Amino acid sequence: MSLLLEPSKEQIKEEKLYQQMGVSDDEFALIESIIGRLPNYTEIGIFSVMWSEHCSYKNSKPVLRKFPTSGERVLQGPGEGAGIVDIGDNQAVVFKIESHNHPSAIEPYQGAATGVGGIIRDVFSMGARPIAVLNSLRFGELTSPRVKYLFEEVVAGIAGYGNCIGIPTVGGEVQFDASYEGNPLVNAMCVGLIDHKDIKKGQAKGVGNTVMYVGAKTGRDGIHGATFASEEMSDSSEEKRSAVQVGDPFMEKLLLEACLEVIQCDALVGIQDMGAAGLTSSSAEMASKAGSGIEMNLDLIPQRETGMTAYEMMLSESQERMLLVIERGREQEIVDIFDKYDLEAVSVGHVTDDKMLRLRHNGEVVCELPVDALAEEAPVYHKPSAEPAYYREFQETEAPAPEVKDATETLFALLQQPTIASKEWVYDQYDYMVRTNTVVAPGSDAGVLRIRGTKKALAMTTDCNARYLYLDPEEGGKIAVAEAARNIVCSGAEPLAVTDNLNFGNPEKPEIFWQIEKAADGISEACNVLSTPVIGGNVSLYNESNGTAIYPTPVIGMVGLIEDTAHITTQHFKQAGDLVYVIGETKPEFAGSELQKMTEGRIYGKAPQIDLDIELSRQKALLDAIKKGFVQSAHDVSEGGLGVAIAESVMTTENLGANVTVEGEAALLFSESQSRFVVSVKKEHQAAFEAAVADAVHIGEVTADGLLAIQNQDGQQLVHAQTKELERAWKGAIPCLLKSKA
């Protein structure tokens, strides 16, 4: 029971207690001006979460406006729970990515689990059935005991929630770098399927309509979670463990099915997840979007704990809760549906016409605030921006090729780097086949799910090489989008749209804000050229630990459409005798590469460059060749360069090998030049494929001897290794590191 006396309005101002909630002096003065009086404790708490970066994007809005958000297929862009893209036949795909970085740093299992739960609710609140989950994870070096603990617990949290709720986790990425040592990144993406007629919005329309609370009871977990997510991590962050929510996937499964049934009922007017800022954000945002107000009686809120105050109820981020607006007089229809699932559905208020959020508790009005001020009128900051000194130095430094004395040894070593190594240890914990629609499981360039009753399928991926962004955020931003699109194309799909998760450090530092601006410029340019609009996403700033920022990490989630399941393609070579091609030229580009990090222990120099027009041309040519049936396998060349891409392609259930000839010195095998693919083609399609893909160069063929042999044009042997030995090293690296005591 809460025994604390809340401070008075005067105390809040005089003692500047609002600063503890992340509200600045100027913001407090603005709040006072907007409402024409001093706010009470509940009201300043509500303003603090709604005006946090996590909810308001007050530091990032000027940057987000750069993104293209419309397109022929876009049915819903940014502004709702998730974006929606048309895929024909009156069907649409719904998807969104969200972060749960700060909670995962201090309570990794629950932090990751509730991140999955929250993004699933965002998707089904739009009326869609979630069909897949992906995740993009970043950790410090896997030699650290603390990092091993975080890694194991985060993966267990994702598996524990996703497996229980029955949604397959079909893909994602895991990368390791010292910059994430104290601040791991846990980004979760959910993809759903919907018929056009079932699309719902989070709007509180219709004066007098009933506001209903459904799902789990409200507790004290997660209070100020949104504020916690809007500040730097420090040694004292452990004290904020109560700001981490606790999830119940079985409750979420019931809530999902009940909500999807309610969506078929025309009594439903609007629906929204109680995510960041809980009851506060869902009520204020739904009213603001509809141009209405909401009045609620907090005495009616289902509570898990006794003696909860209005402040605690409004700021709680207890999981598995939704807010619904129902036609007046039809409440019992909704109650009956939720009763079937043994869930509470309680009328707690109604829609008004005065654009106010009015809350009653214990017979008193404890809050009366304008909804637009909460949801739309947070101050927007144009932060100072300054190019960091290291950037100019890197731009003027062509990173030399690291010395490669033995390319076979180097290939083995690269395949065992945790960022490149097989993530089988991770995805074997996920149920990626549940619901039996998964056609391409984790481990290829993208996850692929069929759409039952049609010939269509969806490909999905997440991508970002943060090292490139550290060296050059604009070029790195372009590359992140391009690599995601390459992965989609390699699966036989046309890239449709993007959801982005902008993970950066403290925007109040000019060098960090410069990174954000430049990365957004690069992402925007790539999305325009590749025709992949940004339909939603998330911003996670203040990712710093004791003053040290993470690498800039704008994760790109992308979905593509496969028109015919016959076009589905994977990265693995299929049969001996097929011809091996590389599309795109290899340049001596080693800055930010896995080879540079491994051999020199740091990254520096001018980042790899990308020509987006060439990228688009190659993607279109390859996709056309795939659709015509010329391509047996396709794999994009990324971390570790051509050598790693060929090795990954040759690791199949058959004991295949490859004999290829490449140009140049051994180190070039591991250059990370952009816009490249490794492709295999049947001999009978050689002429047609070469005519279709002008940039393709024939470098060898798939063999049946289980041997990877790579030589240069001078006849010098570069790599000579048994495929199964390479695969054993690649698959064993992460389990081996986790078992070691170091």
Curated annotation (Swiss-Prot):
Pfam families per the UniProt record, alphabetical: AIRS (PF00586), AIRS_C (PF02769), FGAR-AT_linker (PF18072)
What's a single GO BP term from this record?
Answer: 'de novo' IMP biosynthetic process
What does the entry list as the binding residues for ATP?
Answer: 57, 96, 500, 537
Q: Where in the cell is it found?
A: Cytoplasm
For this protein, the record's InterPro entries field holds: PRibForGlyAmidine_synth_PurL (IPR010074), PurL_linker (IPR041609), PurM-like_C_dom (IPR010918), PurM-like_C_sf (IPR036676), PurM-like_N (IPR016188), PurM-like_N_sf (IPR036921)
Q: Which PANTHER family match?
A: PHOSPHORIBOSYLFORMYLGLYCINAMIDINE SYNTHASE SUBUNIT PURL (PTHR43555:SF1)
Q: What does this protein do?
A: Part of the phosphoribosylformylglycinamidine synthase complex involved in the purines biosynthetic pathway. Catalyzes the ATP-dependent conversion of formylglycinamide ribonucleotide (FGAR) and glutamine to yield formylglycinamidine ribonucleotide (FGAM) and glutamate. The FGAM synthase complex is composed of three subunits. PurQ produces an ammonia molecule by converting glutamine to glutamate. PurL transfers the ammonia molecule to FGAR to form FGAM in an ATP-dependent manner.
Q: What family does the entry list? A: Belongs to the FGAMS family.
Q: What is this protein called?
A: Phosphoribosylformylglycinamidine synthase subunit PurL
- What organism is the protein native to? Bacillus velezensis (strain DSM 23117 / BGSC 10A6 / LMG 26770 / FZB42)
